[in-house]
């Protein structure tokens, strides 16, 4: 049978096929030559079948449906001169995807990028790779290779299913971390725990109130001590409780020297006794946490620990000052008392110790930290406005004899009060020009403050909703948690993902 007869048979067969179901079959490089050595088409039927199913044929024929064992010789993955441009077929549970080999070779450590790994799934009879996996998920997997490492979950694929596909195709920990971040999994800093079991128990007891009932009890005691300390700090300034603790200078005529004495014995003062009890607890807590902490360097980098240190310094500074000032001259005593008052003022920072046990204060701190740029812009705008309007009101009021603005620095306070819309009224312009400047100052202040406020509020809402969602929403399905946890161990990672209500925390397992 000659070539013309075979082509007539092809036309006849194509006419019987449904044209709607015809798909173009991709061509593959092969060492098979459909022509004879003399350049003429071969006369064997198999050579004609090869011509009919080659990529020069635009329509599928009945011969293209012949099983591969009658057409393609079985063997390993086809090799061509330009392997980078070679097209490969990936069959995902019957859905075929076509891409170039160089696209897959971008990531040689993955399942599809490693030749040895993907050859385990090569079907030599059909000349394609076959994976009995989730079909819609492979859109995102193939996009990872095409985009150079960007992972995107298709909208119609559940999170746990796509996470399992990332694990199966061995895309790596970076792809999994990117997927977690895109899906709203907030990765918290890694939690370090002491290696010693005894130290770990005390560290959890004082550092993590939610770890046990005993830890919650310690947290309650710590909060009560802080509240008592702040209460004592405020009550001792009341007139009915305040005693003159400054030293009285008593002149002794016989020796013509100054002798000093305390208005009352400091060690019998009830406020001092209560304060000492609070300081004992603060010191014990601080020293114990320092001894059992897993990293001494990180301990001093923690702002909460710095606040704890600052909160107990005034007590010991006051105690030392009171004990040594009896031998000092009167002038040095006055200086010591001035320093002592400043040191005592630092005690007010103990209120920040409550943030260790208050989610609200932690959210506020996170908001301020995230909004530092906006707060800096706000202060910068206020600074410009203060300089501008204090100068303007000075020159507007300079000819007024009863003006409150004797200089530009005197107008700083008025500009700040006016721009913040407080308006104490202690200083105000009296001339028409000064009132116009005051009006513009108030309007500029409203606009200046209003501009960065929405960004700060947005940051607060973000941290607030993230925290409330962690407490109110139910846990995610255990299947997803299992997949994500197994992903870390499969990739050789020591991190495990605990996602609760839209957030995740990385905990390092230590021996």
From Swiss-Prot:
Localization in the cell: Membrane
GO molecular function, one term: voltage-gated potassium channel activity
Region (Disordered): 25-44, 489-511
GO cellular component, one term: plasma membrane
Tissue expression profile of the protein: Expressed strongly in the inner ear and weakly in skeletal muscle. Not detected in other tissues.
Loss of function: phenotype: Viable with no gross defects. Vestibular evoked potentials (VsEPs) are highly abnormal suggesting impaired function of the balance organ, although mice do not display any obvious imbalance behaviors.
Any GO BP: potassium ion transport
Membrane protein topology class: Multi-pass membrane protein
S-palmitoyl cysteine: lipidated positions: 293
Chain segments annotated as transmembrane: 218-238, 271-292, 303-323, 339-358, 375-395, 436-456
Keywords: Ion channel, Ion transport, Lipoprotein, Membrane, Palmitate, Potassium, Potassium channel, Potassium transport, Transmembrane, Transmembrane helix, Transport, Voltage-gated channel
Motif interval(s): Selectivity filter: 421-426
Catalysed reaction, written as an equation: K(+)(in) = K(+)(out)
Pfam families tied to this protein: BTB_2, Ion_trans
Subunit structure: Homotetramer. Interacts with KCN4B/POMP. Interaction with KCN4B/POMP is necessary for the modulation of channel activity by cAMP.
Family: Belongs to the potassium channel family. A (Shaker) (TC 1.A.1.2) subfamily. Kv1.8/KCNA10 sub-subfamily.
Function: Voltage-gated potassium ion channel that mediates K(+) permeability of excitable membranes. When opened in response to the voltage difference across the membrane, KCNA10 channel selectively allows the flow of potassium ions across the membrane down their electrochemical gradient.
Protein name (record): Potassium voltage-gated channel subfamily A member 10
Annotated source species: Mus musculus
Lineage: Eukaryota, Metazoa, Chordata, Craniata, Vertebrata
């Amino acid at each position: 049978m000659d070539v013309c007869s075979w082509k007539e048979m092809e036309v006849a067969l194509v006419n019987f096929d449904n044209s709607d179901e015809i798909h173009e079959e991709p061509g593959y490089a092969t060492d098979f030559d459909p022509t004879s050595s003399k350049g003429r088409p071969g006369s064997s039927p198999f050579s004609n079948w090869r011509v009919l199913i080659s990529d020069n044929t635009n329509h599928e024929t009945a011969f293209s449906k012949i099983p591969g064992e009658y057409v393609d010789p079985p063997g390993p993955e086809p090799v061509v001169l330009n392997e980078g441009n070679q097209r490969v077929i990936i069959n995902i549970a019957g859905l075929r995807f076509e891409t170039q080999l160089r696209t897959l070779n971008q990531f040689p450590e993955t399942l599809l990028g490693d030749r040895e790994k993907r050859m385990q799934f090569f079907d030599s009879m059909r000349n394609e790779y076959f994976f009995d996996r989730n079909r819609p998920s492979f859109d995102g997997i193939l996009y990872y290779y095409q985009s150079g490492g960007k992972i995107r979950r298709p909208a119609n694929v559940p999170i746990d299913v796509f996470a399992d596909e990332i694990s199966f195709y061995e895309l790596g920990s970076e792809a999994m971390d990117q997927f977690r971040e895109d899906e709203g999994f907030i990765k918290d800093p890694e939690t370090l725990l002491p290696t010693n079991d005894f130290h770990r128990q005390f560290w959890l007891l004082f550092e993590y109130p939610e770890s046990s009932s005993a830890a919650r009890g310690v947290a309650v005691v710590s909060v009560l001590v802080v509240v008592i300390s702040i209460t004592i700090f405020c009550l001792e300034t009341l007139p009915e409780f305040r005693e003159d603790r400054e030293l009285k200078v008593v002149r002794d005529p016989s020796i013509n020297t100054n002798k000093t004495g305390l208005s009352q014995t400091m060690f019998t003062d009830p406020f001092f006794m209560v304060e000492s009890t609070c300081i004992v607890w603060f010191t014990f807590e601080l020293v114990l946490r320092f001894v059992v902490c897993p990293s001494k360097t990180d301990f001093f980098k923690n702002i909460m620990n710095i606040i704890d240190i600052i909160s107990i310094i005034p007590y010991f500074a006051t105690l030392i000052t009171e004990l040594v000032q009896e031998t000092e001259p009167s002038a040095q005593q006055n200086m010591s008392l001035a320093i002592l008052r400043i040191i005592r003022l630092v005690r007010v920072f103990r209120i920040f110790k409550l943030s260790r046990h208050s989610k609200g204060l932690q959210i506020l701190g996170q908001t301020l930290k995230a909004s530092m740029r906006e707060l800096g812009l706000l202060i910068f705008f206020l600074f410009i406005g203060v300089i501008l309007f204090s100068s303007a009101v000075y020159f507007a009021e300079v000819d007024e004899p009863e003006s409150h603005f004797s200089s530009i620095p005197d107008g700083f306070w008025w500009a700040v009060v006016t721009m913040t819309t407080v308006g104490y009224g202690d200083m105000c312009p009296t001339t028409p020009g000064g009132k116009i400047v005051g009006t513009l100052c108030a309007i500029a202040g409203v606009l200046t403050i209003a501009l960065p406020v929405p960004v700060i509020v947005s940051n607060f809402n973000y941290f607030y909703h993230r925290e409330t969602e962690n407490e109110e929403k139910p846990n995610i399905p255990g299947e997803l948690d299992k997949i994500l946890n197994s992903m870390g161990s499969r990739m050789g990672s020591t991190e495990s993902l605990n996602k609760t209500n839209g957030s995740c925390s990385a905990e390092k397992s230590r021996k």
